[in-house]
Amino acid sequence: MNTHEFQAKQILRKYGIPVPDFYIASSSKEVEEIIKQYQLQSAIIKVQVHAGGRGKAGGVKLATNPQEILEFSQELIGKKIINEQTGPSGMISHQVLISPAILIKKEFYLGITINRELASRVLIASPIGGVNIEKIAHEQPNQLLMLPIPLEETFRSYHLIRIASFMGWKGKQIQEGVAIIQSLVKAFKETDASLLEINPLVETKEGHLLALDAKLSIDDNALFKHEDLKTLFDPSQMSNNEARAQQFELAYVALEGEIGCMVNGAGLAMATMDLIQYHGGRPANFLDVGGGASQVKVAEGFRIILSDSNVKAILINIFGGIMNCETLASGIIEAAKGLQIHIPLIVRMEGTNVEKGKQLLQQSGLKILITENLTEAAQQAVQLAQSVR
């Protein structure tokens, strides 16, 4: 689950990490009240969307007087941000973050994520901040320090000295930086985060360290432990299909192709998409219905796929391990009849009760093409999608 910048900053503040003052507004009236109450003369105004690259997309403004604060806020409330991270449909900012402008001397980067190769939480630090960390890793790898976080969830003194030296901190900055690192590790663990970053962490003109921007992503599988964090979820940052998919516990990602995919298992879904691409087609989505999908889930998966007008064919690829092929076939039939599907439907299934499942499909009276293997299924899906055009 992604969060907004202001929510991530609230979490950082809770753990004692210094962040600048900020205010949230979703209307012109609220902006006017903030300007008056806090006597703002200059401010940074930022859109609040679940994506980075907001500045380049026109979503960050520097206002040098109260009138500009109001005008820029009005411009950004309701603004649609479109970039690589939002996808072509973009994301709408329903509120803005207003923060008094401050003078800074230097920018740093601090973040924690999961490194699956090391099977460990990893701290990432760089004396260069305010830019995409992947860009630093690619262009200036010597400016990046990665340290696995020990099992005891705290760094030893020599680790902290190494980080402070690498970042170029001196004097009181060392003490402040060490405290921020320790609090960041604690916050990451206690929120069950998958990503927590401060970018940039800045040195103010007074020489103090301050978290100027923050990003927090929480592991969806751990949300059952965090009723308080569940309230941070903002459904407006998802498409209607993504929100529906989450409601029915379907893993769904919209793409830009013409072949809808319904698969059980993330690995099998990726392989299915690769084969479609290999044979000259383009997947319209990633949709994993999970190992124990019910007829209701299958039907909802169909509804989500069919809501995309670009879809010209649907490929269903199921391995009946946990899922029974007979149950799946019943779900397909019920959904297809109820939704009146008028585009080619290709089904490839293997596993438990596969013959009974195929028999049900064959006797359904529906125009369903049953294939024997995945390669044939992908080829047929591509050919039929092209014929619909």
Swiss-Prot record:
Gene Ontology process terms (BP): succinyl-CoA metabolic process; tricarboxylic acid cycle
Enzyme class: ligase
Cofactor binding comment, as recorded: Binds 1 Mg(2+) ion per subunit.
Known cofactor(s): Mg(2+)
Record GO cellular component, one term: cytosol
E.C. code: 6.2.1.5
Keywords linked to the UniProt accession: ATP-binding, Ligase, Magnesium, Metal-binding, Nucleotide-binding, Tricarboxylic acid cycle
Location of the ATP-grasp domain: 9-244
UniProt pathway annotation: Carbohydrate metabolism; tricarboxylic acid cycle; succinate from succinyl-CoA (ligase route): step 1/1
Reactions performed catalytically: succinate + ATP + CoA = succinyl-CoA + ADP + phosphate; GTP + succinate + CoA = succinyl-CoA + GDP + phosphate
Complexes and interactors: Heterotetramer of two alpha and two beta subunits.
Function per UniProt: Succinyl-CoA synthetase functions in the citric acid cycle (TCA), coupling the hydrolysis of succinyl-CoA to the synthesis of either ATP or GTP and thus represents the only step of substrate-level phosphorylation in the TCA. The beta subunit provides nucleotide specificity of the enzyme and binds the substrate succinate, while the binding sites for coenzyme A and phosphate are found in the alpha subunit.
Name of this protein: Succinate--CoA ligase [ADP-forming] subunit beta
